[in-house]
Amino acid sequence: MKSSGIGGQAVLEGVMMRHKNDIAVAVRKPDGNIEVGRQKTVSPKEKCKVLGWPVIRGVAAFISSLIIGIKTLSFSASFYMDEEEAKKENKKNEGAMMFGAVAFSLVLGVGIFILLPFWGAEGLMKLLGSESAVLRAVIEGVLKLGIFIGYVSLISLMKDIKRTYMYHGAEHKCISCIESGRELVPDNVMDSSKEHRRCGTSFIFFVLFISIIFFIFLRFDSLLIRLAVRLALVPVIAGISFEFIQWTGNSNTVIAGILSKPGLWIQALTTKEPTRDMVEVAIAAVEGVFDWRAYLREQGIEVSGQAAGPEEQ
């Protein structure tokens, strides 16, 4: 079926969904009710035409998604703060906080997933007494993958993170339900797949895979130059990875299916089977940005008048 064009992420006790310039965050509040917050956004390419060019648009989309993700996480967390904490948060400079959060996320990501594997690979190459660029690139890629798998597995032991992974599964199931031509009702969603080709976890796989290919061919004797090149190519690799995930996520070809598989396997680490009440929250988020009934009718599928989920609180 035609791609719905919706995507999202899990937040604290909820789900954020985005379709074009519409964003909705649905959160299960402590009192059990579902709160849905909506907002409009402007895509990077609408702000500047250059940001819509291939590869460049991937970098812009990544940064934009990071900012939106932090904002929606803050929104969901606000329901679980006590009154005094909420007042303190409201008094803070939102712009400065956002800049700090994004900067910290980028620095942490570079440190853990670029610098650590780089130095680890250099150390192993010395132990092996090898100068092979191919071996170095493969070792570095394996270390990156190992660190990522270890990281997501370790934090999944935390109760809140485990529940977030379950909401992540609910988000995926909603998209799978719609794109498989089924009505967005809890029973259908629960029976749907939690695999989603356009997921950010699959994006990470493409980043790892493409970086290995790049660094097999980019060979420099200087250790500092090798490190500088890796840092400089982060945006380029991210941009190319974005193009790949857009293609595999919207293509039904055999090749796209094969290339998607490793990302879907890794996805199993960051998505867990949700409960029915989590699915209800995800449905509320979808309905905040997307008319799934109209989408199904466009595909020639008859839609009943059955309610899709709980009433918005």
Segment roles from a protein language model:
Residues T41, K49, V59-F62, L66-E85, ...:
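Multi-pass alpha-helical transmembrane bundle typical of ion/small-solute transporters
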Residues F75-F79, L106-G129, V207-L231, P235-A238, ...:
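Juxtamembrane "helix exit" motif at the C-terminal ends of alpha-helical transmembrane segments
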Residues M1-S74, S78-M81:
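Divalent-cation
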Residues C48-V59, L233, I237, T275, ...:
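Short, charged, low-complexity patches
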Residues E94-G111, S193-F217:
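Transmembrane alpha-helical segments and their cytosolic interface motifs
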